[in-house]
Amino acid sequence: MHLRLLMSTVITATLIVSNNALTSPSDKTKTRALRGASTVGIAADNLLAAHFSPTLKHKESRGDYNNIQTERHRKRRLYDAPHHPEFYDIAVHQVPSDKSYGGGPAIAIFAGVAATFILIDYLIRHFTEN
């Protein structure tokens, strides 16, 4: 029973975290979530980049490298915006995360999490107690 409860909790938490990552206003988080990258994978990529890249050997170089990457990203976004106006509107005019929509979405999210937990618990019980 405890194992079933633990598995249901872990699977439900994973679904919530992945959903939160996909609905997050951060483009970087969405890209990582859609690529299926975990935080372990991102940390490993950063470690490999720091080990093999000559620009990342020292901490001061890392700051310069991040500034260069940020500037490149900013320029790319400026140049790409006129070619894709529909994406430009989405990227620039995002809904602020602190805006309140009332209690409706919170109740719906709670009901969805509870239903997911119950469904996963049922499936685990069904396949393990045969």
Swiss-Prot record:
One of its GO terms (cellular component) is extracellular region. The gene is RxLR66. It comes from Plasmopara viticola. Belongs to the RxLR effector family. It is found in: Secreted; Host cytoplasm; Host nucleus; Membrane. This is Secreted RxLR effector protein 66. The chain crosses the membrane at residues 104-124. Effector that acts as a broad suppressor of cell death to interrupt plant immunity. Inhibits cell death induced by cell death-inducing proteins, including the PAMP elicitor INF1 from P.infestans. It comes from the Eukaryota.
